[in-house]
Amino acid sequence: MKLSGVFTALATPFRDDLSLDERALASFVDWQISSGISGIVPCGTTGESATLNFEEYCTVVRLCIETARGRILVIAGAGSHCTTETISRALFVQSAGADAALIVVPYYNRPSDEGVYQHFRAVHDATNIPIVLYNVPQRTAIDISNDTIRRIAELPRVVGIKDCTGAERVAALKAILPEKVAILSGEDETALASYMNGGSGCISVVSNVAPKMAVELYRLHALGKINMAKQVSGNLAALSRVLFIEPSPSPTKYALSLMGKMRPKVRLPLVELTSSGQTAVKNVLETLDLLRQQKAMHSQL
């Protein structure tokens, strides 16, 4: 498996009573597929995995796989700060038919680099599913070294890394990682720079809201149309900034509610977007013409 393209870090729809909205989720996945993305990543940070119980987690993963029906890749979030729990989740997504498991660096415990390596090795050795390493120090409080990333990447079924430390690191990782390992940007604002430094794709938050735009950025870079790509990148950066104006994924869910994709509901300890945040999100969506495009699409159905 060689990962490339745009993968959406999928938001999880909730009803007004905060139960899972399975119908909205299936519809949302279909829309993502029709918009041209390469894959979806359910049950990650944007999917509020921290507030899903295990039954809900399993439901989301199964529904995404069933809805995708092999049309795109499904890389299911399976990470935890507990190695045995991570193994249990990875075994579940393997049995459910996911294409790969996204495994975050253990958070809260703050292990050493050797502890991080042993965590990934234990998960790898207990499963048979391809693994994508997720390095996000702003949430885990650990930024593992390039050497440790290389050691993890040498495990046979590690096929990618989602790195959220900036585009500058991509070239250094490209030089030391095996060819089988895709480097995926975890930062929409620097996705183009990541591609230009040798990155293979992006696991994107903004593609929840603007999947076609995120795919277009990837396509333009692949075609060598860098000036046009820079224009699209500027628009995506503006959208990305407003989608993190308050704790994520509250701004993303509000944007999707304006587009008729899901309710803006999030689970505590997250709260819905403030009125000032709502105004900021709506202004950017209108500036980028995303609301009009969505209304036009619905009018054609």
Swiss-Prot record:
Pfam families in the record: DHDPS
E.C. no: 4.3.3.7
Pathway the protein contributes to: Amino-acid biosynthesis; L-lysine biosynthesis via DAP pathway; (S)-tetrahydrodipicolinate from L-aspartate: step 3/4
Family matches, as Gene3D superfamilies: Aldolase class I
PROSITE patterns: DHDPS_1, DHDPS_2
Reaction equations catalysed: L-aspartate 4-semialdehyde + pyruvate = (2S,4S)-4-hydroxy-2,3,4,5-tetrahydrodipicolinate + H2O + H(+)
GO CC terms in record: cytosol
CDD domains: DHDPS
Residues where pyruvate binds: T46, I203
Location in or out of the cell: Cytoplasm
GO molecular function: 4-hydroxy-tetrahydrodipicolinate synthase activity
Keyword terms of this UniProt record: Amino-acid biosynthesis, Cytoplasm, Diaminopimelate biosynthesis, Lyase, Lysine biosynthesis, Schiff base
GO biological process: diaminopimelate biosynthetic process; lysine biosynthetic process via diaminopimelate
Site (Part of a proton relay during catalysis): T45, Y108
Signal sequence bounds: none
Enzyme class: lyase
Subunit structure, as described in the record: Homotetramer; dimer of dimers.
Name assigned to this protein: 4-hydroxy-tetrahydrodipicolinate synthase
Source organism per UniProt: Anaplasma marginale (strain Florida)
Protein encoded by which gene: dapA
